[in-house]
């Protein structure tokens, strides 16, 4: 398995453990998606289709299809991908994506869920710093794992 694929799978595993092991569905659907897309990605426009609701980003022509009962954490995940693309960074589940994901969760859901998600990333040894942030020392990493 490539390092890229392993990183993708570990990111999915961390978010799945955060939101589904706690029986969190958060089915806010379209209103949440519309609010998030409007607040975070002004270039995006919401259009409806028979399969769900499609958000179209004109910058990269990326489509996100959300059902009317999409859990809010899935909406946050997709918006984090959109924020990464707006910065012209490579797609995928890298540390900048995970940082955006935590930030969007904090804005859209609550600091509680953002904290739980960051702890899941810590448990999976997945980094989520912006590139300009200082790396943590070994002592800081150990403290984060056991706190």
Give the residues covered by each predicted segment.
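Active-site-proximal or metal-binding-adjacent scaffold patches in catalytic folds
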Residues: 1-73, 82-147
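Walker B catalytic acidic pair
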Residues: 78
């Amino acid at each position: 398995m490539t390092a890229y694929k392993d990183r993708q799978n570990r990111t999915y595993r961390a978010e799945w453990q955060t939101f589904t092991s706690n029986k969190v569905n958060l089915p806010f659907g379209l209103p949440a998606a519309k609010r998030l897309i409007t607040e975070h990605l002004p270039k995006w426009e919401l259009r409806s289709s028979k399969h769900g609701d499609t958000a179209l980003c004109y910058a990269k022509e990326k489509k996100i299809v959300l059902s009317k009962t999409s859990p809010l954490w899935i909406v946050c995940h997709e918006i984090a991908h959109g924020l990464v693309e707006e910065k012209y960074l490579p797609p995928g589940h890298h540390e900048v994506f995970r940082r955006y994901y935590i930030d969007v969760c904090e804005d859209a859901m609550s600091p509680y869920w953002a904290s739980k998600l960051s702890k899941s990333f810590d448990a999976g040894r997945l980094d989520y710093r912006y590139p300009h942030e200082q790396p943590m020392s070994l002592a800081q990493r150990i403290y984060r794992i056991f706190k």
